[in-house]
Amino acid sequence: NIGAAGQPPRIKNSLHSHFTAEVFMIHEGTFEIYWGLDSESRTVLSEGDVVSIPTRCFRGFENVGEQYGFLFTVLGGDDTGGVEWAPKVFEAAEEHGLVLLEEHGVWDTHKAPIPDGACRVKVMSQEEASNYDTYTEAEMEHRISRIENLVYQTNAPLSSGSYGSIGHLRVIGLEESVIPGGDGFEMNLMTADQGGGVQMHSRKE
């Protein structure tokens, strides 16, 4: 369940939630990640930074840099169960004439009337949405791996060799990782000098 999003500066991704954990890894640019029913908490991530957003927590992101930005997304588990949108997303869409229909997807009412018999996707009530979890910025910081704070493993089997040093770090995992607990998968970071490579080796995983 690996995806990606590319966005020009000042473009936002609307508040949503998943049924499994969602991980953002910044590949290019600078993004502001925000969460909570009213986007009340936020933090800025740069290239190489990783954040794991828990389930039952509305989240979104905006490219706050000056260049085109690109991030990878990873969802835990084999079945992510879909996506839920915050009520304010539907309200904002309707201001522009957009509605979400069960069989037709996003429908622009400025271009054509809603087809006869079409059903709108049920919108979560404000009361239901208010029961979703939120986290302070300090709490979310424990679920963030920042590139400038990384300390690579000193006993990694790839730390030396004829191809040059290769740094290894377990970003997400069940143990000995920057973001502990696991999200249904592991994420490892490896760095090498340009032109480097690895010889045959094995790992306990």
Predicted feature residues:
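Double-stranded beta-helix
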Residues: F58-Y135
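A short, N-terminal "cap"/entry segment at the start of jelly-roll beta-barrel domains
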Residues: N1, E102-L189
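Beta-strand cores of modular interaction/reader domains in eukaryotic scaffold and signaling proteins
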Residues: M25, E32-Y34, S52, G60-E62, ...
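Conserved short histidine dyad/triad with adjacent acidic residue
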Residues: G3-H18, G173, E186-K204
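Ligand-binding pocket scaffold of soluble enzyme catalytic domains
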Residues: N1-G3, I11, F24, E32-W35, ...
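A short beta-strand-loop-beta hairpin characteristic of the jelly-roll/cupin
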Residues: S17-E47, C57, G197-E205
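Extracellular structured ligand-interaction cores
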Residues: I2, T20-A21, T30, G48, ...
